[in-house]
Every structure is written in structure tokens, then in C-alpha cells.
């Protein structure tokens, strides 16, 4: 069975047992009345069952309802169909004041019907020939308004300075000021020029997201013809069907696939309604993607440490034990489904590098947009500063130093022999984003 953990807030006067019992049939075989066609099938075989209800500690009138769904309810290899059933009509149910899907347990019998990520972590490292450290990226800014040639110039400067990747912002598709084909051409030129000068394999996340699946695949085909290593998709706004189609194309044609989660906070930010990001992360691992944005813990975007690391490990690891302290409601066995690299992006700069290296480890992408392009000396020096800071943190960690305790000292030591890093340290020494996370247990 697929197991689901729902946070249920019943309407006043509705017992939690009744609310939990209402969720199970509405998201499986039930309707509001008995119908004569019920007798033409075996409802006991197909109906969802609420098998346990427990109160949420510290919250009034909130309960976790556990529901089991038989696998025969779901089409194989379709995240779209799975979500249509589990989170379809039930969220509008009048007996419920609010409902949130906290977690899913996907059994191997179902997860094995999915291709999953086009390539996975190990294959990506082999393609890039980069090991033993996090990968470095940068989102090109301003996100909208640049011409294709100036955009390509910024890509080249960042890659030449030492970054592994640059990125289209999620908003960048094919607008009047920069059509997609022009952007792809200038970015490919920037990649090849930077590779020739540095001797390293480089990439730019070319956003293939489009208004139709046919147009999306056309853009991915052109990227493949240019010989670039990676494309990008906005998987929530683009949709799971489109994402799975693109993931299949990417595996068949040797392209890595970077996933942006634009629109996720509409779904996952409210504590008692919607769907937790760990569910969206599991769905993405099945639908397919080699990278996905996962918050930073220390930057400008939402993310509490233990909860963030809970779904980061769900993306990377083959097997994860139930751990309620990290928000993981079920033991999850991914069997041989490839892993996904978490991307830390949003309001981060060189002073965050020790914490990011310590929190996310080697199998991650650390992405500095303003933290690269905002360098007072320009884009390439901004990239140099980030690469020097990363190499210093990795070396210090490998020598046994404590990044959490000695991080600032490690950055100061490195800045003594890197003027680019010293300038970055001076610019961003006072920048902090200290707001309380909404996503707490």
C-alpha cells in the first residue's frame, strides 16, 4: 500500500475519527452516498483505509490521520494520477477546516514503475569529472531584461571565474527581450569558451519550460544539438506530466535535468494546509530530475535545519528510517532509484560557505546569484571568491577542522591570499536574514 500522513483540522463539532474516516474514501473509492454500482465491484479491495489517528502535540484540534491506499488505485509510473487521487477533491471537504499532506510512503512495488532521475548523482559526477566537493552555481541576474548577448557574457564571466554551473532564472522562458533560441546559442558559446580557458567541464541550466509539452521538447532537442550538458524545468508550474516526459527525453539523450520548484510555497508553506515539500520532493524523485532546489537553512528563503535535511536525505539516500524529529513519518526504501542533488540557493554569500558545506555535504549544489554577481569587482571576481571560499572550506573539513565553530576564521585565512574573496567578505559582512522559519514540527 501507499501510506499517507494527513494533518487534519476538523470543523467544530466533528470528531477526529469522523474526519479521518472521511478523508480515506473521498481520496479513493467513495462518494457522498451509496450508489447501486458499488455492488459491481469489491470495494473492500480498493478503498482507502484510515488506520490510525493521533493528536498533534502543542496544537489544538489538529490530528495526524494515517491512510493506506491499495496500489491498484494508481496508474503505474504516473505522479499525476497518484496526486489526483490522494490530494484531489478531498481538500475541499466541508467537514474539514484544513488539511495538509505531511508525508507519503511509496512502496518499492510502485516506485519501481518510475524511471526516476535521468542520471543521478554518481553519473553526473562522472560526466563532469568533479569529485569530493559540492558543485558551485550562480543564477544570472537581473533575472529579466538582459539581451541574449549580454546574458551570455555574464554566463562566460561566471564560468571562467571558477563556477561549475550558471542558471536561467525560473522566469526566463522566451520573452520579447530575449528569445529562447538566441539565449541558448550565446550560452553555448559561453560554455565552450570557458571550458577551453579553464580545462573544466562547465554547464548552464537552459530553461526548457514552455507553454506546451511539444515546445518544451523542441527546446530540449536544440540544447542537445548544441552539445550542452544540462537543461532545466519548472516542475510545478510546468506540471508533472511534462516533467516526466522531459526526464525520459533527458535520459535517452544524455542531458542532465535541473529542476526549479517555483510555486512550491503556495502549496507547502502553511503549516496546517496544503502539502509538505518532502512530499513534492519524493514526487520529483519519481517523476525525474537530477537537481532540485531545497532551501538553504541560512539564506533568505524558508527552511528549518532538521526538516530541510530530512527531505534532502530523502532526495539523496537509498534508504531512510522513520524519524519524526526531522518530519519523516515513514521509513522509505528507494531500492535502486537514482538520487537527486539538492540545490541550496537564495540569499547566500561567502560568509555562509562554511555552514553550507557542513550542512549539505559534498553531494549538493551551492548556488550564489547575488552572492556572485554582486561582487564589487564584477562577475568573474565574484565567481573566484566563491570558488576560493569553497576550496578553503573543503580543505579545512578534510583536515578535521570544525566548520561550524571555525568557519569565519577559515574564510578570513583564505581571504589573506585571495583579494577577490577579501573584497567579497567586506561587502557582505553585515548581510543576514534572521527570520523565524514557518516550517517547524
From Swiss-Prot:
Q: How is the cofactor bound?
A: Binds 1 Mg(2+) ion per subunit.
Entry binding sites for substrate: 89, 139, 143, 261, 293, 345
List of residues that carry N6-carboxylysine:
167
Q: What's the chief localization of this chain?
A: plastid
Q: Which cofactor does it need?
A: Mg(2+)
MF-aspect GO terms = magnesium ion binding; monooxygenase activity; ribulose-bisphosphate carboxylase activity
One GO cellular-component annotation of the UniProt record comes to: chloroplast
Q: Does the keyword Metal-binding apply?
A: yes
Superkingdom to which the source organism belongs: Eukaryota
What the protein does comes down to: RuBisCO catalyzes two reactions: the carboxylation of D-ribulose 1,5-bisphosphate, the primary event in carbon dioxide fixation, as well as the oxidative fragmentation of the pentose substrate in the photorespiration process. Both reactions occur simultaneously and in competition at the same active site.
Other noteworthy facts: The basic functional RuBisCO is composed of a large chain homodimer in a 'head-to-tail' conformation. In form I RuBisCO this homodimer is arranged in a barrel-like tetramer with the small subunits forming a tetrameric 'cap' on each end of the 'barrel'.
Q: What is this protein called?
A: Ribulose bisphosphate carboxylase large chain
Organism field: Fouquieria splendens
Please name the taxonomic classification of the source: Eukaryota, Viridiplantae, Streptophyta, Embryophyta, Tracheophyta
